[in-house]
Structures are given as structure tokens and as C-alpha cells.
Amino acid sequence: MTEPTVARPDIDPVLKMLLDTFPVTFTAADGVEVARARLRQLKTPPELLPELRIEERTVGYDGLTDIPVRVYWPPVVRDNLPVVVYYHGGGWSLGGLDTHDPVARAHAVGAQAIVVSVDYRLAPEHPYPAGIDDSWAALRWVGENAAELGGDPSRIAVAGDSAGGNISAVMAQLARDVGGPPLVFQLLWYPTTMADLSLPSFTENADAPILDRDVIDAFLAWYVPGLDISDHTMLPTTLAPGNADLSGLPPAFIGTAEHDPLRDDGACYAELLTAAGVSVELSNEPTMVHGYVNFALVVPAAAEATGRGLAALKRALHA
């Protein structure tokens, strides 16, 4: 007798209504500038943003200079605050300090921490590994200058969404391997870590909102032009961190979305971390789509999902 199919939950109705009203989809044929413009259309009403002390800086390390960052201080400022280095999403090709300003603010408030949001160089103008190089230089700068910001250099975490989750995972490995600042936590929102496009969620959610398979292919073509990714196990660990030795990495929270092509990628990375002895919490959000952290201020279910990751980050930083 055939087992009955268990229907998965639908997309949260408030989120679905928002996506239907303000579609942000694009195709590879549209090109990167159209994609960037569509992402910039997602704006949070200013009155919903928490008022924080914010400072623009240009940082650098070891020959890499002129990396823009935006520093956020939490509502209650005290000495030796923990520091979160945040890497925005957007397929390594879109986004920046402004598109992810609400997200950075949420991390400063939710984690009660200083947040340094990094404006790394984007593809296709600057393909891999330019963004990784900038991100690493910014993390090294934070490690050496945390005290000047009022931060505690012994309590630094990385966080990022989507491509920024990929970068955060890479940064955690580099910090372990290349003598970077010791990290206490990694918060990975719907990251891409495996580059294994054969995972079931890439087919199951091939036409999902926000991020579909066509968009994924465009991002990869812009970020790693001409690279054969058919054998994901042969990719460098700074592109596919799931290929690395994962032992000795900091604890992690991985947030995934049921209606997201990257869902199984995050789940696989969580399994690999666990097998390597790393403490990891995986939270798959059954009614969410890719990018839900960006909707936390306007969609209650997205706020609840985001809150789970921020709570884990806060616990790790204030243990």
C-alpha cells in the first residue's frame, strides 16, 4: 500500500501577499543591473527602523584598502561589547550596505552587539575571489580594531545571509586556519555551502519566489565565470566550504526555509558540522522563502523565524 503524501505547509499568507504585491524576481537575461535595481526596491519604511548610532568607515588589511563598512552600535552601549561581522546576501553580485541596513540593525539590537557590515566587491565586475579577499581583510581589521570600537576582541562572530552565509562559513574556516581572530559563533542564514545542485530542494523549489534555479545559474555565471561546478566535491573550500575539514570550527546556527532551493544545502552543512564535532542548531522554517530575514520588520512569521537565530547569536556572545 502506498504511503500517503504529507503536504508541506504553504508559504506564510502575509509573506505571500507581500511577494505578490511587490515581486522582485528577475531572470538571467535581465542582467545584473536590472537585478540590482529590483533588490533596491525592497525598502523598509524608515519609521520601523530602530534608531542606533551608526558610522561609515573605510577599512583595510594587508594590502587591501578602501573596503567600505558600516558600524552599528546597540541601543545600550557599554564597554567591551561583542562584535558581529555581517556579510550581506545577493548572490555575490547584488546588495550592499543600504539594502541590508535593516538586517544589520536587527542583529545589533537582537544580539546586543556592535555590528560591522561589510561592503565587499561584487561580481561580475569583480568575480571570485575578490569578495572573499575583501571579507577576510575586513574580518582581520575588526580583529585588530575591535577595542577601538568599544568591542571585545575575544567575542567576535560572523553572520550572513545567502551568499553572505557562504562568505561567513568561509571566514570561520579561514580564521581557524590562517590565524585570524578567534570566532565564537557563526550565524548562517540560508547559506550556500555545498554547491551541489543535485540536492532535492534545487528541483523541488526550482520556481520558488525570490530565488529560483534560473537566478542561481545567473549568480554562479557572474561569480565564477567559466568554472565547471559539475563535480562540487572538487571545488575550492573558499567557494564550497562544505568540502573543507570542519573540525574545530565555532558553534553555528543555520536557518533554512522550506520553500527555498538552498534548503537542503544548509541542512547538509549542518550534518557535516555535527559529524565533525561542531555544535550546530538547524532551524528549517516551514512557511518561509529565501530571504526571510529581510522581511522580519513587516512579516510577523519572518520576525519569529529571524528571532530564533538572533537569540542563538545573543546566547553565544553573552555566555
UniProtKB/Swiss-Prot annotation:
Protein name as annotated: Carboxylesterase NlhH
EC number: 3.1.1.1
Keyword Ribonucleoprotein among UniProt keywords: no
Upper classification of the organism: Bacteria, Bacillati, Actinomycetota, Actinomycetes, Mycobacteriales
Catalyses which reaction(s): a carboxylic ester + H2O = an alcohol + a carboxylate + H(+); a propanoate ester + H2O = an aliphatic alcohol + propanoate + H(+); 1,2,3-tripropanoylglycerol + H2O = dipropanoylglycerol + propanoate + H(+); a butanoate ester + H2O = an aliphatic alcohol + butanoate + H(+)
Motif (Involved in the stabilization of the negatively charged intermediate by the formation of the oxyanion hole): 88-90
Subunit structure: Monomer.
Protein activity control: Strongly inhibited by diethyl paranitrophenyl phosphate, which is a specific inhibitor of serine hydrolases.
Modified residues annotated as N-acetylthreonine in this record: T2
Stated pH dependence: Optimum pH is 7.0-8.0.
